[in-house]
Curated annotation (Swiss-Prot):
A molecular function (GO) term: hexosyltransferase activity
Stored SUPFAM superfamilies: Galactose mutarotase-like, Six-hairpin glycosidases
CDD domains (UniProt xref): GH94N_NdvB_like (cd11748)
Keywords: Carbohydrate metabolism, Cellulose degradation, Glycosyltransferase, Polysaccharide degradation, Transferase
GO biological process assignments: cellulose catabolic process
EC number, UniProt record: 2.4.1.321
Family: Belongs to the glycosyl hydrolase 94 family. Cellobionic acid phosphorylase subfamily.
Native species: Xanthomonas campestris pv. campestris (strain ATCC 33913 / DSM 3586 / NCPPB 528 / LMG 568 / P 25)
Protein name from the UniProt record: Cellobionic acid phosphorylase
């Protein structure tokens, strides 16, 4: 399609899924410049924008980079709203017409020449571009193998101009500032490409032994030898700048080494293409320890056969994370997300744990809650692994260590008090999906040698939550709860969390129910009574007349209340008060109205409002974040997902649909352009502060690391379609929005397949469920047989 600006009202001229839903295309590099896609494998991940910028990291075992900024970078985690600039790491291909001197670049950066046609295509298995300049079509494809940290690039140049063309092609992969200790770059004929070498900086002797096996080389290998090369960034760029490098303007690259200069990887190929002729080039780009590893990677991958074998293996790897539901509804965008992209994102989180060695405990448990629907055995193992690090007090650590030698880093060095809450939440979902009640009796041994059953460890965790309360019965917050940067409410040891108080009630409620269903009546009674006590404390101390306060500071100041000019109302306490049964009918009506009036935006409900505009030092650093960004009043999709789940739990189907649909770009062009997000993932937030900063409200963070996805997948399965495990049965209690006349679902559940047709019938007053033509009086499917297919007809009131 033309790369010109899209038509104002036809979203399909800007972006659209392929017919089979396996890919999503964007037809402009300028309308949504930060939109893109991501790939990962067991060792690495790479996020690519439609314009060619890239952010990549691999594990050794901690995250590391092989393409760097051109200046000294601080080590950090994946960032929301990653800023891009001319010298940002990327993967670029310059194309020069040798007869006219015209210069282009693909995908779009750095030359930024307008293309005749442009298509960026995010796929499940690879990322592609198809760009046409002056009759020359350049097709790029990047993919990953399953187990090695290497990018596999294919570039096809096709002459569609109708005349013979003389061209030069220049793959240019900047390497950046690798190290202040040692960095270099040069061409290796023996290895077949450019190899850049460095030493990760260190000063302590112990670090030498820890780092000596690091992959400190970065390579760009070619299948076909080039006519020339450059390995020095400044020599390549020269006086022309990246948009017109001096080396590219010359007849031939200068074969420059980099000797303690910023290295780069640039190759030159000369092409003479007859009309309709095409040439294909393949490259491998990534990190390595030494020449032997580089040579092995070249032998393994750098051929047509190697690329094909890697693609086949990677497709099988992703197949292991296929979803358990396929849907057909009146909303095609929802269908595409749920059928293709949402389970992929859930799998990414649970399979590689966000590519970290110490995931936050809450993230680890929620990510693996999602895996309960894709790979239940993996989810089970994650629960047992997490509990193996439980403290003798019953508390859970701030992070879960995944490999030997891993340490708690960054936010995991800050004490938070919510981690025990997520254990029964995980179990509630896991048991409903699998029926694996035997896990409750599984024995888990901790580092101190103590061996206890899962059930006993949950008892201890729930008791820890009850003990970690003040005299009023409210939960201490320390330096944060789910909201990490709420770090100054209770740093002196007195402040309490309103959210954690009702979340504790919800956790106790779930665990009491699990105990009751599994013959643990004494514990069910004990924790059931505790639910009533915690809820009573929340209503006595936190109810502000129309909604629940967010907390009470060390100095006894309630916040998140009507008297506050900023941060007047927070979403999370309201959502979890619904889940915990804290709010009675009158309170429920009041808080739902308050959320709609004060938190709703066209892009979903914000996390708090109004956003803070200055530091409030009895709340914490979240108030220093930009208004509407992240925890300071963004449409923070993880919190939105909690609210969505709570709405389904109280049976508010239409309000829930409104919230669910707002997570997706569109359906109109203006909404999609404002968000700038390609719907191949759910981002961790869209900008908030809609009333304060409307120009940027709705803008996507583009960050695909988010606890949102497991909850949204659960909401679709168990809320929207109501297909949820209940003991040994599958319950059917759908909550379709009232304007949907019908929907179809194919659900995999406990080894059986359920083909469900849902129809809304005018005049009907009661839900009816037929299983293979026979009415089910309790709207459940009993006696499920693995391997069997069940036909369900579900008739909903009109």
């Amino acid at each position: 399609m033309s790369a010109a600006s899209p038509a104002p009202d036809d979203l399909a001229t800007l972006m659209a899924p392929s017919a089979d839903g396996m890919r999503y295309a964007l037809y402009s590099p300028t309308a949504m410049p930060t939109a893109g896609g991501f790939l990962w494998n067991r060792r690495m991940m790479v996020q690519l924008t439609c314009r060619g910028y890239a952010t990549a990291q691999f594990m050794q075992p901690e995250p590391a980079k092989y393409a760097h900024a051109p200046l000294l970078e601080a080590r950090n985690f994946m960032m929301p709203e990653q800023p891009y600039y001319a010298h940002h790491p990327g993967r670029f291909f310059y194309l020069k017409d040798e007869d006219t001197g015209a210069l282009y670049s693909v995908p779009h950066e750095p030359v930024r020449a307008p293309a005749e046609t442009f298509e960026f295509s995010a796929g499940k298995h690879d990322v592609r571009w198809r760009v046409r300049h002056d009759g020359i079509v350049v097709e790029l494809c990047v993919s990953l193998p399953t187990d090695d940290a290497v990018e596999l690039w294919e570039c096809r140049v096709h002459n569609q101009s109708g005349r013979t063309r003389r061209l030069s092609l220049y793959p240019y992969f900047p390497i950046g500032y690798m190290s202040w200790m040692h960095q270099s770059g040069g061409y290796s004929p023996e290895l077949g490409g450019i190899v850049c070498r460095s030493v990760t900086p260190y000063q302590k002797v112990d670090d030498y032994f820890r780092q000596r096996d690091f992959k400190d080389c970065t390579f760009l290998l070619h299948e076909q030898p080039p006519v020339a090369w450059d390995a020095q960034q400044m020599a390549f760029e020269g006086e022309g700048g990246l948009h017109a490098p001096s080396a590219v303007q010359a007849e031939q690259l200068g074969n420059h080494d980099a000797h303690y200069e910023n290295p780069a990887a640039a190759l030159q190929y000369r092409l003479s293409l007859a009309p309709d002729a095409a040439t294909v080039y393949r490259f491998a780009f990534g990190p390595a320890k030494d020449d032997a590893e580089i040579a092995a990677l070249r032998a393994r991958y750098l051929s047509a056969e190697g690329f094909a074998a890697a693609a086949q293996d990677y497709a099988q790897y992703l197949q292991a994370g296929r979803g358990c539901v396929q849907i057909a509804t009146p909303d095609a965008a929802l269908d595409n997300l749920v059928n293709h992209w949402l389970p992929r994102q859930v799998f990414y989180h649970g399979d590689v744990n966000r590519l970290t060695t110490d995931p936050q405990t809450r993230n680890y448990l929620q990510d693996h809650m999602g895996m309960a629907y894709l790979q239940p055995a993996t989810a089970r193992a994650a629960l047992l692994h997490a509990l193996s690090q439980q403290e003798p007090s019953g508390a859970m650590p701030d992070g879960i260590l995944l490999v030997e030698g891993a340490e708690l880093k960054y936010i995991n060095q800050v004490p938070h008090t919510d981690h025990c809450v997520w254990l029964p939440i995980f179990l509630d979902a896991y048991l409903a999906e699998t029926g694996d009640v035997a896990v409750l009796d599984a024995v888990v041994r901790t580092h101190d040698g103590q061996a206890l059953s899962v059930a006993a460890r949950l008892d201890a965790a729930m008791q820890w939550l009850l003990d970690a309360r003040d005299a009023r019965g409210l939960s201490f917050i320390a330096q944060g709860d789910w909201n990490d940067p709420m770090n100054m409410v209770g740093w002196r040891g007195v402040g309490v969390s309103g959210w954690l108080t009702v979340a504790t009630a919800y956790a106790l409620r779930l665990w009491s129910g699990i105990c009751a269903a599994n013959g643990r009546s004494a514990q069910a009674t004990q924790f059931g009574q505790a639910v009533e006590e915690v809820n009573a404390a929340a209503n006595r101390e936190l109810w502000d007349g129309h909604w629940y306060a967010r907390g009470i500071t060390d100095d006894g100041v309630r916040f998140g209340i009507a008297d506050d000019e900023e941060g007047r109302i927070y979403l999370n306490p309201q959502s979890w008060a619904l889940l915990a049964g804290t709010a009675d009918a009158e309170q429920r009506t009041a808080l739902l109205a308050a959320v709609r009036e004060q938190l709703h935006t066209p892009y979903g409900p914000v996390m708090l409002a109004p956003a803070y505009t200055h530091m409030r030092d009895d709340v914490g650093r979240l108030t220093q974040k930009w208004p509407g960004a992240a925890e300071n009043g963004a449409v923070y999709n993880h919190a939105v997902a909690f609210y969505l789940y709570s709405l389904y739990q109280i049976g508010d189907a239409d309000r829930a649909w409104e919230i669910l649909r707002a997570m997706l770009p569109g359906p109109d062009m203006a909404d999609a352009l404002q968000r700038g997000h390609l719907p191949v993932s759910l981002p961790n937030y869209y900008r908030g502060a809609w009333h304060q900063y409307p120009r940027t409200a709705g803008r996507s963070s583009q960050l695909f690391n988010t606890g949102t996805v497991a909850w949204v997948y659960r909401c679709v399965l168990e809320g929207l379609f109501g297909l949820v495990g209940d003991g040994d049965a599958l319950a059917v209690r759908p909550q379709l929005p009232s304007h949907w006349p019908q929907a179809q679902v194919t659900r995999q559940f406990r080894g059986a397949q359920f083909e469900v047709a849902l129809t809304r019938e005018p005049g009907r007053t009661q839900l009816e469920v037929q299983v293979d033509g026979v009415v089910s009086p309790d709207q459940r499917v009993h006696g499920i047989v693995a391997g069997r297919t069940y036909q369900l007809q579900v008739r909903l009131p009109g």
